[in-house]
A protein has these predicted regions:
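Single conserved hydrophobic/aromatic residue that forms the stacking wall/gate
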Residues: 1-13
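Structural signature of FAD isoalloxazine-binding scaffolds in flavoprotein oxidoreductases
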Residues: 4, 19-21, 25, 156-166
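Catalytic-pocket segment enriched in acidic/His residues
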Residues: 10, 57-196
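A generic local secondary-structure boundary/capping motif
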Residues: 14-19, 24-25, 33-40, 68-72, ...
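Short coil/turn connectors at secondary-structure junctions
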Residues: 15-16, 21-24, 43-46, 94-96, ...
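Short beta-strand segments
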Residues: 20-30, 51-53, 141, 164
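RNA pseudouridine synthases
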Residues: 29-31, 36-51, 57
Length: 196
């Protein structure tokens, strides 16, 4: 298995009962820029790919205020693939069907036209804050249907399949690893979201 590459067949999840999924459209920067006008933003994109934004919910809510990025930062979280597709191969990169299946069940289904902020707006805004460099990845957000909303979470052996129109599908098998961490210490307020 490839654990830190663009795409791999297995995704190690830490020994936690509350690891969640989010399918996302990922833009990969191909031309550096700062203060990029919205109308020129797509000129800075090398291509798009599918991203599986994996989140360990207890790690996110372990502190006050919550630190959402912390729960997404474990080794092997955030696989991307199956290929980097250039914008000229897509009819409209701002309107692509997006879907996630967990163990064969469709749990997320939408279109990137439903994003709160489209790709161009996100790139332009971010470039006002930080310079964008070649190879930077911008994850654009996820539709409804993440596991925490229904009390469903990734387990050892689960298959997660994420697809975006024109970009292909990426399938990963979840493999549980032990890491001697505070994996299942759940903050009190979060317990109402979780089902036994």
């Amino acid at each position: 298995a490839i654990y830190r590459g663009l795409v791999g067949s297995e995704m190690c999840i830490r020994d936690s009962d509350y690891v969640d999924w989010e399918v996302e459209l990922v833009a990969v920067i191909g031309k550096e820029g700062k203060n990029i006008p919205k109308e020129n933003a797509l000129e800075h994109v090398a291509g798009l790919c599918v991203g599986q934004d994996i989140s360990d919910r207890p790690a996110q809510f372990a502190t006050t205020p919550a630190m959402f990025n912390l729960g997404k930062s474990f080794d092997t979280y955030g696989p991307m693939g199956p290929a980097l597709v250039s914008l000229d191969l897509l009819e409209n990169c701002e309107s692509l069907d997006i879907e996630c299946k967990w163990k064969g069940e469709t749990v997320q289904k939408s279109n990137t036209s439903d994003l709160i902020f489209n790709i161009s707006s996100i790139i332009s805004y971010l470039s006002e804050i930080v310079s964008l460099n070649v190879g930077d990845t911008i994850w654009t957000g996820t539709p409804s249907g993440v596991g925490i909303a229904s009390g469903k979470f990734l387990k050892d052996g689960d298959i997660l399949t994420s697809s975006i129109e024109g970009l292909g599908s990426m399938e990963n098998k979840c493999v549980r690893i032990s890491d001697h961490s505070r994996a299942n210490i759940v903050p009190e307020f979060m317990k109402g979201f979780l089902k036994d």
